[in-house]
Regions:
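Bacterial N-terminal signal peptides that target proteins for export
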Residues: 2-12
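N-terminal signal peptide c-region/cleavage motif recognized by signal peptidases
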Residues: 20-22
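Low-complexity, acidic/polar, glycine-enriched regions of mature
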Residues: 24-196
C-alpha cells in the first residue's frame, strides 16, 4: 500500500515538473548592449528647423517568451548623457528648464511586447520622465535575432519609434513648444545579448 501511494506521488510530481518546466524555460532573458543602444529623438525648433538628439548611456533588460508570444522591456536612460552634438546645447538640455538631470538623472521605460505571428511588433509601456509617468506606445519596424559572431550567444536587435509631447511631462522648456509644436518623435535603436 505504501509503495502504491509513493508511486502515485512520484507520478504526480513528475507530471507537475513536466508541465511547469517548459513554461519556465521558455522565457529568454536579454541584457541591453549599451554600446549598441541609443534612444534618439527629434522635435521642431520654433517651426523653422528640426533638432535631433540622443542619449549615449542606456541599460536594461528584455524578456521574450516565444512559446507564449509575450515579452517585457525595462529600459533605464541616463539623462546626463544627452548628446545634441553641440556642447552648449547639451549643457542647456541638462538644466532645470529641460531634463533637470541634477534632480532626475534617469528616465525609465517599462513595457509589454505584443507579438504578431512569431515576432514582436509593438510595445505598450509607461515612460517616466521628470518624475511623471505617461503611456507611450512603440512600433517595432525591425526585430531580428542572430547568433553573435564574437560572443557566441544570441543577440536581438530592434528599431523602434513612437511619439510623446514635452508638455505632458512638465518640462519647463515645453512652454516654447505647446500643442503640436511640443511633439517629439522617438527613434530607438537597441541590441540585447541573451543571458545564460
Amino acid at each position: 500500500m505504501q509503495h502504491r501511494m509513493l508511486g502515485k506521488k512520484l507520478i504526480h510530481a513528475a507530471l507537475v515538473a513536466a508541465t511547469a518546466g517548459p513554461a519556465f524555460a521558455a522565457a529568454d532573458r536579454y541584457e541591453i548592449e549599451p554600446n549598441h543602444t541609443y534612444p534618439s529623438f527629434e522635435f521642431s525648433h520654433m517651426g523653422i528647423s528640426v533638432w535631433r538628439g540622443k542619449f549615449d548611456r542606456t541599460s536594461g533588460r528584455i524578456t521574450i517568451d516565444r512559446a507564449a508570444g509575450t515579452g517585457t522591456a525595462e529600459i533605464v536612460i541616463d539623462t546626463t548623457s544627452i548628446d545634441f552634438g553641440l556642447d552648449k546645447m547639451d549643457e542647456a538640455a541638462r538644466s532645470e528648464d529641460w531634463f533637470n538631470v541634477a534632480k532626475f538623472p534617469t528616465a525609465t521605460y517599462k513595457g509589454t511586447l505584443t507579438f504578431v505571428g512569431d515576432f514582436p511588433r509593438t510595445v505598450e509601456g509607461q515612460f517616466t520622465l521628470l518624475g511623471i509617468t505617461r503611456p507611450v506606445k512603440l512600433t517595432l519596424n525591425i526585430f531580428k535575432c542572430i547568433p553573435h559572431p564574437m560572443f557566441k550567444k544570441e543577440v536581438c536587435g530592434a528599431d523602434a519609434e513612437g511619439d510623446l509631447n514635452w508638455s505632458e511631462y512638465g518640462m519647463k522648456h515645453s512652454k516654447y513648444g505647446e500643442g503640436d509644436a511640443g511633439r517629439v518623435h522617438l527613434r530607438i535603436q537597441v541590441e540585447a545579448l541573451k543571458q545564460d
